[in-house]
């Protein structure tokens, strides 16, 4: 961000978007580039993400927070992994829970945010805003997880290794965990305990041998950061995934060269999820000359647009 900009810098007029029939998403985004506010930021995010993915020397980190998998974003992320556009994924446990639910053929359903939640409770239906999930799905998920844990090696494992083993037991090409396991892309989940996957691991451990070292992934993750010639981060939401990605670079002499944040959170409360990427520069997490932008909008809207536009540009290289 240029804090020295002033009213004297009247060099770039706002250009209204021109919408014509049969436009591609990339053509629409290019029209956004002449606009201000969120439209201009979205166009900037596409430019940065394209440069980040096109760079062969850049290690690409992806932070996944929020309820992205129940909302229908898992296939997009699985495709990004499959196409080599994600080198490292850091996620919440909940996103991997819902990814596994779908991979087992246990669907989420479109519902209503105006539902009678007491009635839903009586009908054994859980609500995630306007998404419904039957309680029975969790019973089926728990049985699957217990069978996976029973087949794990009886040695010290990292959380990443546990998630890889879960992915190996799934058969769904839209699954994030399955695709990551197939492609050899590490999936890190620093707060796995805060999910059904973690809860079921604890329940299994109560009566069986299971040794998961919560710190084991850090050495591996730091090595990736050290070895990165250049680093870029796409951050959906904030929370643990965002901080885990950004703080790890502090251990190295480097900073992130590219950073994109898709969030609805505000910076005024001081929470990490709303903290700006400019603020991250004060910590040395994002480089002084980094290309970065925060897009304040629902990531279920912005992520598909960004990925679609960037894919079009990459196909024309």
UniProtKB/Swiss-Prot annotation:
Keywords: Hypusine biosynthesis, NAD, Transferase
Cofactor annotation: NAD(+)
Key word Translocase present: no
Descriptive protein name: Probable deoxyhypusine synthase 1
HAMAP family: DHS
BP GO terms, sorted: spermidine metabolic process
Protein family according to the UniProt entry: Belongs to the deoxyhypusine synthase family.
GO cellular component, one term: cytoplasm
Pathway: Protein modification; eIF5A hypusination
Gene3D superfamilies the record matches: Deoxyhypusine synthase (3.40.910.10)
Functional note: Catalyzes the NAD-dependent oxidative cleavage of spermidine and the subsequent transfer of the butylamine moiety of spermidine to the epsilon-amino group of a specific lysine residue of the eIF-5A precursor protein to form the intermediate deoxyhypusine residue.
Gene symbol of the encoding locus: dys1
Record's catalysed reaction(s): [eIF5A protein]-L-lysine + spermidine = [eIF5A protein]-deoxyhypusine + propane-1,3-diamine
Enzyme class: transferase
Matching PANTHER family: DEOXYHYPUSINE SYNTHASE (PTHR11703), DEOXYHYPUSINE SYNTHASE-LIKE PROTEIN (PTHR11703:SF2)
GO molecular function terms listed in the Swiss-Prot or TrEMBL record: deoxyhypusine synthase activity
Enzyme nomenclature, EC number: 2.5.1.46
Active site residues per record: 285
Source organism: Methanosarcina acetivorans (strain ATCC 35395 / DSM 2834 / JCM 12185 / C2A)
Pfam families: DS (PF01916)
């Amino acid at each position: 961000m240029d804090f020295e900009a002033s009213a004297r810098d009247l060099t770039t007029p706002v250009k209204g978007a021109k919408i014509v029939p049969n436009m591609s998403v990339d053509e629409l985004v290019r029209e956004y580039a002449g606009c201000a506010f969120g439209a201009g930021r979205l166009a900037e995010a596409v430019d940065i993400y394209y440069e980040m993915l096109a760079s062969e020397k850049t290690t690409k980190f992806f932070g996944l927070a929020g309820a992205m998998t129940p909302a229908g974003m898992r296939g997009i992320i699985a495709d990004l992994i499959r196409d080599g556009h994600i080198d490292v994924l850091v996620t919440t446990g909940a996103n991997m829970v819902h990814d596994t639910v779908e991979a087992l053929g246990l669907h989420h359903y479109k519902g209503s945010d105006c539902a009678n939640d007491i009635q839903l409770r009586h009908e054994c239906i859980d609500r995630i805003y306007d998404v419904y999930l039957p309680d029975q799905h969790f019973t089926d998920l728990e049985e699957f997880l217990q069978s996976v844990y029973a087949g794990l090696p009886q040695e010290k494992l990292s959380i990443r290794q546990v998630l890889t083993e879960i992915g190996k037991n799934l058969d769904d090409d839209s699954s994030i965990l399955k695709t990551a396991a197939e492609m050899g892309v590490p999936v890190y989940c620093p707060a796995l305990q805060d999910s059904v996957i973690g809860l079921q691991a604890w329940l299994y451990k109560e009566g069986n041998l299971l040794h998961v070292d919560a710190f084991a992934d850090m050495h591996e993750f730091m090595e990736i950061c050290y070895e990165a010639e250049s680093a870029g981060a796409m951050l959906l939401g904030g929370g643990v995934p965002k901080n885990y990605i950004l703080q790890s670079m502090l251990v190295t002499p480097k900073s992130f060269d590219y950073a994109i944040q898709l969030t609805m959170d505000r910076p005024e409360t001081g929470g990490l999820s709303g903290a700006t990427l400019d603020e991250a520069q004060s910590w040395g997490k994002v480089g002084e000359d980094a290309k970065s932008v925060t897009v304040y909008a629902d990531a279920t809207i912005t992520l598909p647009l960004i990925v679609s536009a960037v894919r079009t540009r990459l196909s024309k290289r």
